[in-house]
Regions:
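Sec-dependent bacterial lipoprotein signal peptides
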Residues: 1-2
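Glycine-rich beta-strand-turn "strand-cap" elements at beta-sheet edges
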Residues: 5-27, 63-69, 100-121
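Post-signal-peptide N-terminal segment of Sec-exported extracytoplasmic proteins
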Residues: 22-60
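A mature extracytoplasmic/lumenal domain signature
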Residues: 46, 66, 78-80, 90, ...
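Acidic/polar helix N-cap motif
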Residues: 35-38, 70, 82
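Short, glycine- and small/hydrophobic-rich beta-strand elements in well-ordered beta-sheets
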Residues: 5, 51-75
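An amphipathic, aromatic/His-enriched active-site/gating alpha helix that lines ligand/cofactor pockets
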Residues: 8-10, 54-60, 79-113
């Protein structure tokens, strides 16, 4: 497992964007399927994404987990203050660079799901 602990206020130099009353915090799961033998390369590339993403002011946590039974399967678990923070994340240069870096490592398309934090509804 590769993970970074969720950020606290002390870990960021910028305040998080204000959450509007009609918006909810968001959780993303992104399952990634890697070709056998490419796991170490993928983890190295993912560390860059984890580090940069956790610095985003709207990111509340960005972690990567590896399936212990199917070691070529990974899942990113991401938490954001709102949809605008996700849109910002998807528009960053390192997000696009990461997609290019791992394109030859993946065995199947990534499965991305976005959720509202239900307890806020």
């Amino acid at each position: 497992m590769v993970a970074c602990k969720p950020k606290t206020t002390e870990q960021t130099d910028k305040p998080a964007p204000a959450v509007q009353t009609t918006e909810y915090q968001k959780m993303i799961t992104a399952r990634v399927f890697i070709k056998p033998g490419k796991e170490t390369d993928f983890i190295s590339a993912a560390k860059m994404m984890i580090e940069n993403s956790n610095k985003e002011e709207g990111c509340l946590g960005y972690m990567l987990y590896q399936d212990p039974y199917e070691e070529t399967n990974f899942i990113f678990v991401e938490k954001y203050v709102n949809q605008a923070a996700i849109d910002f994340h998807f528009g960053t240069s390192y997000f696009k660079e990461f997609g290019t870096m791992i394109s030859d490592m993946t065995s199947n398309p990534m499965e991305i799901k976005i959720y509202d934090i239900a307890a806020e509804k």
